[in-house]
A protein has these predicted regions:
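Core catalytic alpha/beta fold that binds nucleotide/phospho-ligands
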Residues: 1-253
Length: 253
C-alpha cells in the first residue's frame, strides 16, 4: 500500500501476553542477529515485548513497501535512534519511530524524501508512585514549572505526564535522547487546538499545535492525546518545509 502524501500514520497495537505459537510466528520476522540479541534477555515478559515490538515494526513497514518483514535493515544514530538503512530509505522514503508503555505499542510512519526530517513519538502510562516533584526540579524548564505550580495534586500529576510525553517525543525526534538537556526547551500546555482527525475509540482526545519554546523552534509540530485508562501519547516532528500534516490512525489486534 502506497503511504498517503502528507499523512502521519499512527499504528496502535495492544501488547498482550503472546501465546507461544504466535510469539514463534512473530520471531520468524526477525533477523538471526535480532533473535540472538532478544534471547539474551532474561526477563520473560520484557523479552516477549521486545520480540513483539520489533516484529510489528517490520510487519508494518512491509504494508508500506514491497519488502518482506525480514528484509528491512536498520541503522542507528549516535544515541541509538533507529532508522532505515540508506539504500532502503532511498527506495521507500519512509521515516518511523516507536514507543511502548504498559499494554500499548505506538508506531508512527510517514513518507517524505528528506533524510533531515525528524520524527518522534512517546506513549506514557500515568504512574502514581513516581515522585514527580523530584523529576520536575531536575528536568523541567522554568516555564513548565510555572505551569504546574498552581495546580492541585491530581491535576499536576496528569499535566506532568503530558509534559513528559511531549518532551520524550521531542528528544526522540532529534535523536539526541537524554544527552539533550531536558530543561533547555519547554512545551506550553495551554496552547494547541482539538484535532478533528478520526481516531480509535481508545483515544478519547487529541490536540495539535502545542507550542515548543524557545521561539526559534516554531518549525516543530506537536500533538498530544489521551487514552483510557491513564495513558497519554505525544508526536513531535520537524520537516524542512511547512506541511499541514494529517493524522491517520490504525488500531492493531
Amino acid at each position: 500500500m502506497e503511504p498517503p502524501i502528507n499523512a502521519v500514520q499512527l499504528f496502535l497495537y495492544p501488547l498482550r501476553q503472546s501465546e507461544p505459537l504466535k510469539l514463534k510466528d512473530l520471531a520468524l520476522c526477525l533477523t538471526p542477529a535480532e533473535r540472538e540479541k532478544f534471547a539474551r534477555i532474561s526477563h520473560k515478559e520484557v523479552q516477549q515485548r521486545a520480540i513483539t515490538s520489533r516484529a510489528l515494526l517490520r510487519k508494518t513497514l512491509s504494508t508500506q513497501a514491497p519488502l518482506a518483514a525480514r528484509e528491512w535493515c536498520f541503522d542507528y544514530g549516535p544515541q541509538g535512534k533507529p532508522r532505515l538503512c540508506d539504500e532502503q530509505f532511498q527506495q521507500t522514503q519512509l521515516h518511523f519511530n516507536l514507543s511502548h508503555s504498559g499494554d500499548w505499542l505506538l508506531l508512527a510512519l510517514l513518507k517524505h524524501p528528506s533524510p533531515e526530517l525528524q520524527l518522534g513519538v512517546d506513549i506514557e502510562r500515568l504512574r502514581m508512585r513516581t515522585s514527580i516533584d523530584t523529576v520536575m526540579r531536575h528536568y523541567f524548564a522554568p516555564f513548565e514549572l510555572q505551569q504546574l505550580r498552581n495546580l492541585d495534586d491530581a491535576t499536576r500529576r496528569e499535566a506532568f505526564f503530558d509534559l513528559w510525553a511531549l518532551k520524550e517525543s521531542y528528544i526522540k525526534a532529534t535523536g539526541k535522547g537524554l544527552a539533550q538537556p531536558l530543561d533547555g526547551f519547554a512545551f506550553d500546555l495551554s496552547s494547541g487546538e482539538a484535532c478533528s482527525a478520526e481516531r480509535p475509540a481508545e483515544i478519547v482526545s487529541m490536540r495539535r499545535g502545542l507550542l515548543l519554546k524557545p521561539k526559534e523552534n516554531t518549525q516543530w509540530q506537536s500533538w498530544l492525546g489521551h487514552m483510557e485508562p491513564g495513558y497519554r501519547l505525544a508526536l513531535t516532528l520537524w520537516a524542512p518545509a511547512a506541511i499541514n500534516w494529517q493524522l491517520q490512525w490504525h488500531l492493531g489486534q
